[in-house]
Amino acid sequence: MKKIYHIRKNWEFQAIINSKRQVISKNLIFYYQRNNTFKIGVSIPKKFAGAVKRNFYKRQIMAILRDIQDLTNLEYKIVMIVRKNFMALDFLEKKKEIQKMLERFKNEKRK
C-alpha cells in the first residue's frame, strides 16, 4: 500500500475515532469517517507487545491490505484497531478476518 494512503498523525487518528462510527468484531475494530480519498491507519495498543512485534503486525496488515484490490475506491478514512486475539492468528486467518471486516464495513456504510 502506498504511503499516500496511510494515516500517520495522532490528530487524524483522534478525529476519526471521535466520529464514533465503527464496525466491531472479535478481533478488530474499524472506525471510519467519510473523506474524498481513501486512507487507512493501523493501531496496536502498547500493552499487547513490544515495539518490534507491533511493527511486525502492522507490516503484516499492510501487506494484506496491499493484496486487496478495490480498497482505493472507498472514499473513507479508516482506523483499524487490533485486539489481542488477532495477533495469535496465522497470516491466512488474518487475511480472511480483514476481508470479512471490509465486507461488513462496505455493507454497513450502505445503510
Curated annotation (Swiss-Prot):
<comment type="function">
    <text>RNaseP catalyzes the removal of the 5'-leader sequence from pre-tRNA to produce the mature 5'-terminus. It can also cleave other RNA substrates such as 4.5S RNA. The protein component plays an auxiliary but essential role in vivo by binding to the 5'-leader sequence and broadening the substrate specificity of the ribozyme.</text>
</comment>
<dbReference type="GO" id="GO:0042781">
    <property type="term" value="F:3'-tRNA processing endoribonuclease activity"/>
</dbReference>
<keyword id="KW-0819">tRNA processing</keyword>
<protein>
    <recommendedName>
        <fullName>Ribonuclease P protein component</fullName>
        <ecNumber>3.1.26.5</ecNumber>
    </recommendedName>
</protein>
<dbReference type="GO" id="GO:0001682">
    <property type="term" value="P:tRNA 5'-leader removal"/>
</dbReference>
<dbReference type="GO" id="GO:0000049">
    <property type="term" value="F:tRNA binding"/>
</dbReference>
<dbReference type="InterPro" id="IPR000100">
    <property type="entry name" value="RNase_P"/>
</dbReference>
<dbReference type="InterPro" id="IPR014721">
    <property type="entry name" value="Ribsml_uS5_D2-typ_fold_subgr"/>
</dbReference>
<dbReference type="InterPro" id="IPR020568">
    <property type="entry name" value="Ribosomal_Su5_D2-typ_SF"/>
</dbReference>
<keyword id="KW-0540">Nuclease</keyword>
<keyword id="KW-0255">Endonuclease</keyword>
<keyword id="KW-0378">Hydrolase</keyword>
<comment type="similarity">
    <text>Belongs to the RnpA family.</text>
</comment>
<dbReference type="GO" id="GO:0030677">
    <property type="term" value="C:ribonuclease P complex"/>
</dbReference>
<keyword id="KW-0694">RNA-binding</keyword>
<dbReference type="Pfam" id="PF00825">
    <property type="entry name" value="Ribonuclease_P"/>
</dbReference>
<comment type="subunit">
    <text>Consists of a catalytic RNA component (M1 or rnpB) and a protein subunit.</text>
</comment>
<dbReference type="GO" id="GO:0004526">
    <property type="term" value="F:ribonuclease P activity"/>
</dbReference>
